[in-house]
Structures are given as structure tokens and as C-alpha cells.
Amino acid sequence: MNTSIAFIGGGNMARSIIGGLLKQGVDKSRLHVSEPYEPTRPALADELSLQVVNDNVQVALAGQVWLFAVKPQVMKAVCAELKETAQANKPLIISIAAGITATQLDDWLGGGLPVVRVMPNTPALLGAGANGLYANERVDDGQKHIAEQLFRATGLCTWIADEALMNTVTALSGSGPAYVFLLCEAMQAAA
């Protein structure tokens, strides 16, 4: 992959995606990470052997693709900080935040952007996940390929034509594995 990726947020899911990309041989100079929580930055940098900073704009300027891995409740504020840069650079926007629509993201970043929503699930942390992907009308085939390449590093990928179905993907794929793990733990405890 020759695309530079800006990870806005360095939580568990971002770590799993980055880890999968590194295992696939992606050049770490193409990966840029911003993490606001200071105590997390050194551990994240050591774990991934990457530079991790506290500057979303700096990271965004380095990426052709911006992968938003922040909590939904802070997404609007993060987008406001990056709106001017988004309009100047027109990157491919990818979000793994549940409940935030492609239209909302596009609006918050100033409009006219290619946006992909992805709903990964917890097995992605082990490279065995299932990802539902939705692209708005501005995402071209090349950008779809980039998004799919990114998430194949964590597991299977399926494109969804209707964004309304992302809620179903979130409910089943996002939460389903947790229920299966809970059932397995209960069966193990009962044995």
C-alpha cells in the first residue's frame, strides 16, 4: 500500500488496524497517529514502533486517508478542528465511530468529501474480524479499494449499499461476538 494514512485516535481498534497493516508489510513511514490521551502515547509508540503525537492537524496533513478512530461523542469537535484542512486537502475520510452517518461527517468537515463508514468488531483485535463498509456517492472505486485493503488487515470485508443497514451491522457484527464469548465463558464455567 502506497497510501499515507492519518489515524485520528489511537485506541484499541486503531491499534488492531495498524498492527494488521504492519504485519502485511506496510511501510510504517506511511502511518501517522494522533492520540489525545498523554499516558497512552508512549505505550502506543513503543508497541507499534511509530511516532504518536497529540496534534490532529499535523497528522492529517501527512495523510491522504484520514481514519477517524475516536469516540462518537467527540467526533463533531474533532471534525471542527480539522474542517479547514479537510477542505484544503480533500482526503478520503474513513470512520469507525458507531452512529455517526456519512452525511454528518461530510457536513462537519465542510462537505464535498469522499466518506467511508466502517463497522469493525472485537475479533478484529485478533485479525479475525468482520467489517461492514459503506461508501457515500463521492467515493470512487480506487478509494473503495484502499478502504477495503485497510480493513482486510483485520478480517473479512463486506460492502453495504444502504447506509441504514449499518445499524444492523453494528448490532449483529459489532455486538454479536461479545455475546458468543460470554456464552463460551459461561459454558466453560459450568463444565
Enumerate the predicted regions with their spans.
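NAD(P)+-binding Rossmann beta1-loop-alpha1 motif at the extreme N-terminus of oxidoreductases
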Residues: 1-61, 128-129
